[in-house]
Design a protein with these regions (language model features):
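Conserved acid/base catalytic micro-environments in cytosolic active-site loops
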Residues: 1-8, 14-25, 29, 40-55, ...
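Glycine-rich phosphate/oxyanion-binding loops and their immediately adjacent helices
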Residues: 37
Length: 353
């Protein structure tokens, strides 16, 4: 029998610590082994209690979560989930750049009334974080800041033969890291990513993804050529599409939100269906809502294939579940095998449930 995931809860609010402990303790797969009020206590208890996962508040006395994080990373193999305020995306992604595995946004008001809703997401994020290899977390911490560069050796800027469109929302950043760590150059493909994020997070996500693979990662700009071995991440506030046939370009549009979000996956997937036809692959990862389901249907109808994250490995099985229910999932797979399924698809091995 697998032992429970050991969790250390860190927050300067006694009420929040109590509520989180109670909420997490309902799941027998998780054991809260301790709590801490300050960053200093968090460091000490991480060493003493050896938790698998630390939930770490950002704003705390003595040492903030940001200041305590590098000490926790250096002194343990614990995966760290940041508890972030909605008004500090730059600080949250600074924490991710320092090695935190994931984050959850605390509501500015009414945290007590929201705990039931948040606890289910937090439990799933804890389980997902636990699956992240400690050495990959360390690689993120040790890597120097990078400026993503799309310059390629001679011959590498030819248009791709296949397009891979990837959609993610809640739980998406670590899921994307897992997927791209299993992909690399030489597959004659370009990758187009829609990740639902608050404003200000996209550039940091691109920097993190660039550390997982030898692909080039860029924040997409209107009119960019679509080149093989490059991943284009949609910027906040604009829908991303790919247009053209022989020569493919990125198109960014300030059109109305779809499913309440912009960028949304459906416009991207539908454009990939039109531009790539049978050479298109759609991937729907963890996330709330139904974004990606309609676009996946378009890709399948155009002769392409879709790969959908399974319920067990998803933080929220909203987007993947909606895709399955519409009958647009060519294959359903756990997160850790999705990169393998993408490679198989790129090599022409078609997979169907």
């Amino acid at each position: 029998m697998r032992s429970a995931i050991k969790v250390l809860v860190v927050d300067d609010s006694a009420l929040t610590r109590q509520m989180l402990t109670r909420a997490l303790s309902v799941d027998p797969a998780v054991e809260v082994v301790g709590t801490a009020r300050t960053g200093v206590e968090a460091i000490e208890k991480t060493v003493a209690l050896v938790p698998d996962v630390v939930t770490l508040d950002i704003e705390m006395p003595e040492l903030t979560g940001i200041e305590a994080l590098p000490h926790i990373i250096r002194s343990s193999t614990a995966r760290v989930i940041m508890l972030s305020g909605v008004d500090d995306p730059d600080t949250t992604y600074q924490a991710l750049d320092l090695g935190a595995t994931d984050f959850i946004v605390k509501p500015a008001e009414g945290f007590a009334s929201s705990i039931a809703e948040l606890s289910d997401i937090l439990l799933k994020k804890i389980k997902l974080a636990y699956r992240v290899r400690p050495e990959s977390r360390m690689a993120v911490r040790e890597a120097a800041p990078v400026v993503c560069d799309v310059q390629r050796p001679d011959g590498a800027t030819a248009p791709p033969s296949r397009l891979v469109a990837i959609a993610a929302s809640t739980g998406g950043p670590p899921a994307l890291e897992t997927v791209f760590s299993g992909l690399g150059s030489g597959l004659d493909a370009a990758y187009l990513v829609v990740q639902h994020l608050p404003k200000g997070f996209t550039s940091s996500l691109v920097r993190r993804l660039a550390r997982t693979s030898d692909l080039a990662f860029v924040v997409a700009e209107d009119g960019m050529l679509v080149e093989r071995d490059t991943a284009y991440v949609a910027p906040h506030g604009l829908h991303m599409k790919v247009t053209g046939r022989r020569t493919l370009r990125i198109t960014l549009e300030d059109t109305p939100s779809v499913h309440g979000v912009r960028p949304a996956a459906d416009p991207l997937f539908q454009s990939v269906a039109g531009a790539a036809g049978a050479q298109g692959i759609g991937v729907v990862l963890t996330g709330m809502g139904a974004d990606g389901a309609r676009g996946s249907r378009a890709i399948v109808d155009a002769g392409g294939m879709t790969i959908v994250q399974d319920e067990g490995s998803s933080v929220v099985w909203g987007m993947p579940g909606a895709t399955v229910r519409t009958g647009a999932a060519s294959h359903v797979a756990p997160l850790e095998t999705i990169a393998t399924e993408i490679r198989r698809g790129l090599r022409g091995v078609r997979v169907h449930e």
